[in-house]
Amino acid sequence: MKKYFRFVVLLFLPVVCCLLTVATHAQNDSGLVKHKIAIFAPLYLDSAFDQSDEYRYAKNVFPKFINPGLEFYEGSQLALDSLNKDGVPLEIFVYDTRSAKETFEQQLAKPEIQDVSLIIAHCSNNEVRLLSETAARKKIPVINATVPNDAGTVGNPYFIILNPTLRTQCEGIYRYVQKYYSINHIIVFRRKGSADDAIKNLFDEYSKSTMATPLKLRYVDLNENFTGDQLANHLDSNRNNHCIAGSLDINFGRQLTLQLASISKSYPITVIGMPTWDGIKDFSKPEYKGIEIIYSTPFYNSKMDKVSQGISNHFSTKMYARPSDMVFRGYEVTWKFAKLLLKHSKDLASNLGSKQDKVFTDFDIQPVLNKKTLTLDYFENKKLYFLKWQDGIIKSVN
């Protein structure tokens, strides 16, 4: 706990010192044009610190709800530190979207936002629409780094979604199964309800538009307390069974995989899950051995490259902790799009799909067209990695 609290102190102090001021990462040469970037993240500073900047919680307590936004910010800060060492002309504004002093809408209306060239946001579903509207109204590229939601965005070439929408995820899973397992026995296990119906509808819709041979998907609705024996009634012991989890619910996915693993000695099974499975760590446990588990994710980092190792070493030596995936996300998004801004300046919106300045992820940013008007609605990352858990080991399979 002592080491972890030291991590808290080291991490929070820089945020407290710079949040309400403009952190300038630029050379003093007045001839340089300083590109301005606004970063929005849920830092919860007013929840963590009182008016005297004293930590509100006990020294051995660190609320988990603070982690994601703070870790994203820390990654962004590391990227900005690296850019600052290169003397790049950037001016950074950081906003705590959970501030008790001003609303998110008020932050977006601040005078300095009028002049920024790029907005990077670790946002929630409730904030996506405001970000999209701001991007369109001010003609500022906005990077939605976290939420797979377009909030009904139409006709907005300045809005970019890095975490693919459910439609993109379902189409990607369908194509993956179509490419590798089309001749096998394919069952979609699901629950009754509108959430799982949405996934079924997306599969069925893509099945009608695909240029390749459509998959023969068989849908099976499961009750709440289903067993391995009940699943076995829908499997074939003489064929490879590919079972798709037709639900985003993590508990359903975990239970489905566990029950399939329990009968895997009698049935050859591969289970294919949803992007929400990226947060399931149980798959490394012994009870999941014997079954092949595959799921999709837009963000994959093997952490074998020099940049990843440098970030890990920084956290280990300075903070006595391991960097989370959100730290790497913050670093990657800030570095890549800041570099693109420096190269393309006012023409950034036309170069958002550039493959240059890759850090960890092979982003494939493509225009999303309105099916009725065939005009551009927004940009979206279409890249999906497929990862496989087998006997406690995970690796990329595409």
Question: Where on the chain are the PLM-derived regions?
Answer:
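Bacterial Sec-dependent N-terminal signal peptides
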Residues: 1-34, 188, 394-398
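Segments of small-molecule ligand-sensing domains
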Residues: 320-324, 338-394
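Short, well-structured alpha-helical segments in soluble
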Residues: 101-117, 229-239
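Short beta-strand elements in bilobed, periplasmic/extracellular small-molecule ligand-binding domains
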Residues: 84-99, 208-224
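Periplasmic-binding protein-like
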Residues: 112-124, 142-145, 185-191, 218, ...
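Extracellular/periplasmic periplasmic-binding protein-like sensory domains
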Residues: 257-329
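N-terminal extracellular/periplasmic Venus flytrap/periplasmic-binding protein-like
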Residues: 27-110
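Extracytoplasmic ligand/sensor domains, especially the bilobed periplasmic-binding protein
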Residues: 120-189, 193-203, 279-281
